Amino acid sequence: MEKIQMTTPLVEMDGDEMTRILWKMIKDELLLPFIDLKTEYYDLGLEHRNETNDQVTVDSANATKKYGVAVKCATITPNATRMTEYNLKEMWKSPNGTIRAMLDGTVFRTPIVVKGIEPCVRNWKKPITIARHAYGDVYKNAEIRIPGPGKAELVYTAEDGTETRELIHNFTGAGVIQGMHNLDHSIESFARSCFEYALSTKQDLWFASKDTISKKYDHRFKDIFQEIFDAEYKEKFAEAGITYFYTLIDDAVARIMKAEGGFIWACKNYDGDVMSDMVSSAFGSLAMMTSVLVSPHGYYEYEAAHGTVQRHYYRHLKGEETSTNSVATIFAWTGALRKRGEMDGNAELSAFADRLEKATIATIESGKMTKDLALITTMENPTVLNSRDFILAIREELEK
């Protein structure tokens, strides 16, 4: 069989633990037999990040700027336990955080819907995509533990020395304070990424915050979204037959529970972090959730929405069999290959990505699945496969 050719490489970011094992299986069984795969490879495994003082993460992000499309394996974000386990020089930052900041991107997470894995919310029929702003808020905050009575203020000092002060609280005892920030240009990039993604997928866009309480911080998000929509996207949305809709975050949650899905829900950083896990769990499994980082500059980075599956990896190291769900990692590859095909005018490559996704879904819908799905499926007597056999079953379906 003649392999599908590629003209431009993908940026390939390898990762850690069980997902790294699955990564190689997916390439060996589902990609390399069918595609003359061209990638520029970066090893983002924690050991190599430590060896390079995390320079490899920066290099991979710069390569994504050069080539436009990347695919990333799940990676470890180290904590104190990992510092000891891997004998790290320092507690390296989250690779995802570094890449997001360098690409100025927005993360879109979408559940993979299959028959037999029913959402907890009965009326959800179509995927709900969460768009998470990837800068600032609590993730770039400053915090002070207040030891006792005193006055806490927000102070802004302009370049000319002028000060603006706002009282936070007069403390009569111990407490805690937190300062957060965001940037207009980052919010603008977030808004444009959301509007562009809505147009490309032809889905309605919702944005929600709490501007009634946060009259300056959250209201700034609301205003920027509305200004950009009115100036740049109102006519395009009307032509595409889609809508932009703003509401309060609590109202959005109530509406989500009654909706049937099929839209994009844009959230601030923390809201998106929480709500994407809620939506993925309610649709069935975090292992059935795709994630794509979209930059307003035209860069795309695809990955699974879940972590490195640490417990399965430790069992794998002991020689024990695992039944690890590889679907989201497969869909990271298909998303990247499809986008590469679109950007290069390579219809054959994009068509292969579609075929592989259909083969993956068909395998599950035929009753062959990993243990996590077997525990939640409505099918009777599903066949539980181990990690490798599940991938081999997909290959068998792909070759039909």
What is each residue range found by the language model?
Residues 2-8, 18, 22-23, 28-53, ...:
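N-terminal alpha-helical transmembrane segments of multi-pass membrane transport
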